[in-house]
């Protein structure tokens, strides 16, 4: 089974990664409506892959939806967002903190992978999680690098404020990881690292030292076994 995360890249790349086999795909989760996350949503829908996102995200991504198929709205209630059962995957959405209509993160569980945290485009992680085996987490920028670029006139101050209100800094990422029980975690994958405001190598080394875990930097073509056990 396979569960897709986001729909921001050309779907032909996803197809290639799947070896052309869409029969094992049980769905696609989208965190929010920005183009790098939802811009290719029609390509996914046109292959009849079920897409799931918040109502706010679906409305915000309307300009990208040009398909006879429509995404499925994840319902929100007094007790939080509804739990999804997609094949053998259980998905628990949670609210993210980003400059988007109704952004989400996801806790995903499967018998083979254990618990997976997927959190991107959020300046703060409002929840802690139990039973984590693998983590995909944003580590977007270093506040010192960001401030230095503003001081040097490389970027406007308004952009600095936007980044601070929308993305997870290295230090906040580290705090979020420390707030969770990482005992059974096999992999931490750092995602959405800014080219200009981040330092992926330094982030990886710092988080590996602080957590004692295997830490990866997300990049095209990266393959990692997300097993429940270390081997």
Show where each model-derived region lies.
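Active-site environment of divalent metal-dependent phosphoester hydrolases
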Residues: 34-38, 58-61, 100-101, 125-127, ...
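Conserved beta-strand hairpin/beta-sheet module of binuclear metal-dependent hydrolase folds
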Residues: 1-23, 104-121, 134, 143
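Conserved catalytic scaffold of divalent metal-dependent phosphoesterases
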Residues: 82, 88-98, 108-116, 122-124, ...
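Active-site metal-binding loops of divalent metal-dependent hydrolases
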Residues: 7-9, 33, 56, 96-99, ...
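Active-site metal-binding motif and surrounding structural segment of the metallo-beta-lactamase
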Residues: 10-56
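Metal-dependent catalytic neighborhoods of phosphoester/phosphodiester hydrolases
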Residues: 39-48, 62-64, 198-206
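Cap/insert and terminal regions of metallo-dependent hydrolase folds
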Residues: 130-221
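Metallo-beta-lactamase
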Residues: 55-113
